[in-house]
A protein has these predicted regions:
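Polar, glycine-rich mid-to-C-terminal structural blocks
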Residues: 1-11
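Exposed aromatic-hydrophobic patches
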Residues: 12-30
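Long, ordered, helix-rich scaffold segments
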Residues: 28-172
């Protein structure tokens, strides 16, 4: 996607350096809302609280050329799905029902399939992207922790991925 930062030449990438708590930049000629790929190639540990939509995270997961951002998108999507499922099961589903639920939307499974099938991506990187957040990390994100529910939800997600991506796993 060519970008035209107001007052600069057209390019496909622009590095914007933050020097203040709040800053604004204007891009021209954009006809739709872009998906930001933030903190590209950054090596320092930074926590960024940006309200990515599911569609933006799916775009980053499937297409971002920055490996960390691709991994982070997968982690954010998986964590969001897990925490929502944990909250929902607390109110509605029994554990047995939860173990057989398809928690991951098909769009997430398809984006993960693209990663697994990508011929230029390293096998070790694919493994990282396809690894769900740990039970302990999921627990850290919750106000009320139910270890059995966390385990049940994560296992249901893991099982769903294993079954949905079995042909790709075997071919990899």
């Amino acid at each position: 996607l060519p970008l035209q930062l107001q007052g600069h030449n057209v390019g496909t990438e622009h590095t914007l350096v933050l020097h203040q708590e709040e800053q604004a930049w204007t891009f021209t000629g954009i006809t739709s809302q872009p998906t930001p790929s933030l903190l590209r190639s950054l090596s320092a540990p930074v926590l960024l609280d940006y309200p990515f939509t599911e569609a933006e995270l799916l775009t980053l997961l499937a297409h971002d050329s920055d490996a960390f951002n691709r991994w982070e998108a997968a982690q954010r999507l998986s964590l969001r799905i897990a925490t929502n499922a944990i909250a929902a099961t607390a109110e509605t589903a029994t554990e047995k029902e939860q173990n057989h639920a398809n928690l991951l939307p098909q769009s997430v499974v398809d984006a993960l399939r693209l990663v697994l099938e990508h011929p230029q991506l390293d096998a070790a990187f694919k493994e990282l992207v396809l690894t769900l957040p740990s039970e302990s990390y999921i627990a850290e994100q919750l106000d009320s922790v139910d270890p059995q529910r966390i385990h049940s939800v994560r296992e249901a997600m893991r099982r769903q991925l294993a079954l949905a991506l079995q042909p790709q796993w075997q071919a990899a």
